[in-house]
């Protein structure tokens, strides 16, 4: 990232030793390492975020182009025209309500049932015998 070679690093170490002294140099090196690590992480996060945003913008642009080729604008115009026509008919219906039909025509008629069906009588053998007896 910074393209620092060994000679440059050695020069920085010697200057740091002269300026800070042998007691504070390890502490300063540790703190410097922590800060460099934090900076690298931040740069990496920012770089990945920028990449994600660029990819998202590419996708939006591609979708926009695909939408143009599919004629979405034409479809949207057709839908809007249909909605306007439906609104016109709705206004006509609200201005001129239909006259109500007579109550007899508006209510559905149920089929009339004739007389209630009577149960069928079953003939038992004893009834047959009594009828034959009556005939004689």
UniProtKB/Swiss-Prot annotation:
Any Pfam family hit: TatA_B_E
Annotated stretches, region: Disordered: 89-136
Transmembrane segments: 1-21
Localisation: Cell inner membrane
Keywords: Cell inner membrane, Cell membrane, Membrane, Protein transport, Translocation, Transmembrane, Transmembrane helix, Transport
UniProt keyword Transport, yes or no: yes
GO biological process, one term: protein transport by the Tat complex
Similarity comment: family membership: Belongs to the TatB family.
Self-association and partners: The Tat system comprises two distinct complexes: a TatABC complex, containing multiple copies of TatA, TatB and TatC subunits, and a separate TatA complex, containing only TatA subunits. Substrates initially bind to the TatABC complex, which probably triggers association of the separate TatA complex to form the active translocon.
Protein's UniProt name: Sec-independent protein translocase protein TatB
Organism: Hahella chejuensis (strain KCTC 2396)
Lineage summary: Bacteria, Pseudomonadati, Pseudomonadota, Gammaproteobacteria, Oceanospirillales
Gene: tatB
